[in-house]
Design a protein with these regions (language model features):
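Alpha-helical membrane segments of multi-pass proteins
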Residues: 1-209
Length: 209
C-alpha cells in the first residue's frame, strides 16, 4: 500500500494542491467563469483525496490493535466496500455546493467561500480514505462512477442553460446561460471516454468478459 514516508509526502502534496487551488487570487476568476470554478473545485477535491490516501497509509502502517480511534476510521472507510466514503458522502457534499443558493452563499461571503473549500477538501479526504481499502474492481467502479457523475452534472447544466435560452429564470445569477451550456458540454464530453473505458475495465475486473 505504501510507507510512512510516502504518507508524509502525500500529505505535503495534498496540502500544496489545496493551498494553490484555494488561492484568493483565483477567486475573481471563479466569479467570471464557471469552467474555472469547476476546475478549481476538482483540484481541491483531488488534493483532499491525496491527503485521505496518505492518512490511510499512515494509519495502516502505524496503528495497533489497541488503537480504537485508528481502527474505527479504517473500518468506517471500508463500509459497503468503500461506497459510503468514496461515493455517497462526497456526492452529497458536492451536490450541496452546486445548488444555486449555495453558489450564491460561497460567492457572497468569506464564510461561504471558506466552508466550501473545507467541504470540498473533506469530500476528497473521505474518498481517499476509502480508496486505500478498495479492491481493483472497486477502483474501476469508483472511477466509472466519478466520471459518470461528472457527465450527469454536465447534462443537468446543459439542460439548465438550454432551458434558460428559452426565457425561464437563470437560477445561477453569477453565470450566463451560455456559460452553463458550454460548461455542461465540456463536462459531458470529458467524461464520455473515461466512462466507456472504466465500464469495460470494471466488467473485466469482475470477470464478466
Amino acid at each position: 500500500v505504501g510507507t510512512p514516508l510516502q504518507a508524509k509526502l502525500g500529505l505535503i502534496i495534498g496540502l500544496a494542491v489545496i493551498a494553490g487551488s484555494a488561492n484568493p487570487v483565483l477567486f475573481p476568476l471563479e466569479l467570471q467563469s464557471e469552467p474555472t470554478k469547476v476546475s478549481i473545485d476538482t483540484l481541491i477535491i483531488f488534493g483532499g483525496g491525496i491527503i485521505g490516501y496518505a492518512l490511510y497509509v499512515y494509519l495502516l502502517n502505524s496503528f495497533t490493535s489497541n488503537d480504537t480511534a485508528a481502527n474505527g476510521i479504517l473500518r468506517a472507510s471500508r463500509l459497503l466496500k468503500g461506497v459510503v466514503f468514496a461515493w455517497i458522502l462526497p456526492a452529497l457534499i458536492i451536490l450541496f455546493w452546486y445548488l444555486p443558493s449555495s453558489v450564491t452563499f460561497s460567492f457572497s461571503s468569506f464564510l461561504g467561500a471558506f466552508l466550501e473549500v473545507v467541504s470540498m477538501a473533506v469530500a476528497g479526504v473521505l474518498a481517499g480514505l476509502a480508496w486505500g481499502g478498495m479492491s481493483k474492481a472497486m477502483h474501476s467502479a469508483t472511477l466509472f462512477t466519478v466520471f459518470f457523475m461528472s457527465g450527469t452534472m454536465g447534462e443537468l447544466l446543459t439542460e439548465e442553460g438550454g432551458i434558460n435560452v428559452f426565457g425561464t429564470p437563470n437560477y445561477f445569477p453569477y453565470y450566463s446561460q451560455a456559460q452553463l451550456l458550454y460548461t455542461g458540454y465540456m463536462m459531458w464530453v470529458i467524461s464520455l471516454i473515461p466512462v466507456t473505458f472504466y465500464a469495460v475495465k470494471m466488467l473485466r475486473d469482475l470477470g464478466i468478459f
